[in-house]
């Protein structure tokens, strides 16, 4: 795992811990975590910016998918993936506190295109060129499409 992916995992774990301890300002928590990463000096400013964008984007996706999964009658693929990932802790906190995710993330805006080289924490990414499905369950750097080598993906819901 490269440094950016490692810091991604640590940042999400730190957010989960602070949420569990009662803090609720997600934006402030992400910004404080960003400042801590900058102080380590292990990542460039560009890497820190990419890391922060990736965490915010994945938190937004988590929030939307989590809310949609609550409306479903059956155990969704999304919830099965969550139960087996580092996002379980965040899902547990969400269940306990019933955070209003839409309000928390209303200012976030992702245009839906993910590029190789970005860190992604969770998602079913689909190549825009050949439609190859690339499931991501743990933080990792998005590679080129293994089927066609394209570098752009769209996130889609996990399907049964």
UniProtKB/Swiss-Prot annotation:
Taxonomic superkingdom: Bacteria
Pfam families (UniProt xref): DUF1451 (PF07295)
Stored InterPro entries: DUF1451 (IPR009912)
Protein name per the record: Uncharacterized protein YbeL
Native source species: Escherichia coli (strain K12)
